[in-house]
Amino acid sequence: GINKQNNVNGNVEYIALQFPIHKRLAMSVGLLPYSYVGYSFGAQRTNEANLNYVETYNGSGGLNDLYVGLSIDVWKKRLSVGANFGYFFGNIKHEQYSIVGTGNTYNANRSQNLEVRDLKMDFGVQYTHPISKTEEVTLGLTFSPKKRLHSTYTNTSVKYTDNGASEVISSDTLKNQAYDIPNSFGFGASYVKKDKLTLAADVLYETWGKAHFYSSDNNFKNRVRVAAGGEFIPNAQNRNFFSRVRYRAGAHYSNSYLMINN
């Protein structure tokens, strides 16, 4: 008997629009990815009956943030504050397959599906200080408060026989389950010399160590992400193509919020 299963997944990278609605008020709307799951690995094992089988683990899906943002110029186009009002949605699926390579045994599939639908908010403040007519420095702070998202969690186990029949061993659907996204604190700074040089860096700190995921309270640790980048234009006014090319480089580092037991 041959068992075959196909999965097709799609994902939108991002959509974002910004536009002024008043001389001191601007709006932004967009669809941004918040998290992404994508993995596949397996191993050959031996069960209690001394039969060899292949165990495969797959993960797919992600969470997206559909948001509307507002920002207000508080002081002389230098100091501004803003907030995003977002709708969180998405599905995350984890699957485990056990495939036995004999004609009188069965294959098994266990899947866990998380479906999230909820609201969230983010806040920010930004200050720009001009150094000269062509240079400025910008500093920014962001804060996203901890949010307990309401979600639906489905855990299903299915057995497949060689003749193509399937039997649901167990299926549990838990609605209005608790799934946390943590407090998030961000700081960024940039230096811009008009038509010449841009340097920027930011730091993000997330308190995953206090996050809750259903019955698990101790599987996460706090996460730090550091990123830096720059852009250089040799001569923006020169007619030579390579003099007007924007040369960019960047790097980032982050630790995982997952706590792996040794």
Predicted regions and their residues:
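Subset of outer-membrane beta-barrel
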Residues: 1-262
